[in-house]
Regions:
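Charged catalytic cores and adjacent phosphate/nucleic-acid-binding surfaces used
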Residues: 2-5, 80-101, 105-207
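Short coil/loop linkers at secondary-structure junctions
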Residues: 23-27, 56, 149
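Conserved phosphoryl-transfer catalytic core
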Residues: 7-34
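Conserved acidic, metal-coordinating active-site core of Asp-based
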Residues: 36-98
């Protein structure tokens, strides 16, 4: 699944790059240079190249809206088909991970929470820079209702962020971090026990 998503995003980046160089005298090589060190090419890298070329002074501004706002007549895109959310949950758990929904307030994902809890959603991101106090209270209350983990963070993207937020300005409280670590330990024990039961069952079958 991860390879499929990576490939789709790579193709989308290439298509968008071609559309950009048709509009502006920048090279694909320069755009790719701006994405050096990244796992993929993103809109911010394209804006970085356009900044270098003198077409804008900021990553997020009028030109960004002109190129990447769906309502703009100059909108350029290459839609990426993402995996089904249930497949994503299964993949996270199969890899030994904990599935947490990122900033539900920003994407208005509240209705989806109730749907995903039975499918194995483990937690919700409560503390996020763009979530107001009332939104945080709402998310936390939902997490308590469904006995979900709670996390937080700055959503730090370095220079590629619309609002500069230094690392550590929005953190997961210690009690939530402890719950997260304890949950991980519990899951590991459950997985180990399940593997032992499978091995014992196979041993009996082969006896």
């Amino acid at each position: 699944m991860q390879k499929n998503v990576y490939g789709a995003r790579k193709r989308a980046g290439q298509i968008i790059t071609m559309k950009v160089i048709q509009k502006f005298p920048v090279s694909a090589e320069h755009i790719m240079k701006c994405a050096a060190g990244s796992t993929n090419l993103y809109k911010q890298h394209i804006m970085h190249a356009l900044m270098d070329a003198g077409y804008t002074a900021t990553v997020f501004g009028e030109l960004y809206q002109q190129l990447f706002s769906k309502d703009s007549p100059d909108y350029i895109s290459s839609p990426v088909k993402y995996p089904d959310v249930y497949e994503v949950l299964d993949s996270i758990h199969d890899a030994g991970g904990i599935a947490v929904m990122a900033h539900p307030a920003e994407y208005d994902s509240f209705d989806l929470i109730e749907e995903l809890v039975p499918a194995g959603l483990d937690g919700l991101e409560v503390w996020h820079p763009r979530a107001g106090e009332e939104e945080r209270k709402r998310i936390f209350a939902i997490a308590e209702r469904y006995d979900l983990l709670t996390t937080g963070g700055t959503d730090f993207h370095g220079m590629y962020t619309s609002s500069p937020l230094p690392l550590g300005t929005c953190r997961t409280p210690e009690e939530s971090l402890d719950a997260l670590l304890n949950y991980k330990t519990k899951k590991r024990r459950e997985q180990k026990k399940a593997m032992q039961e499978v091995e014992m069952s196979l041993a009996v079958s082969n006896a």
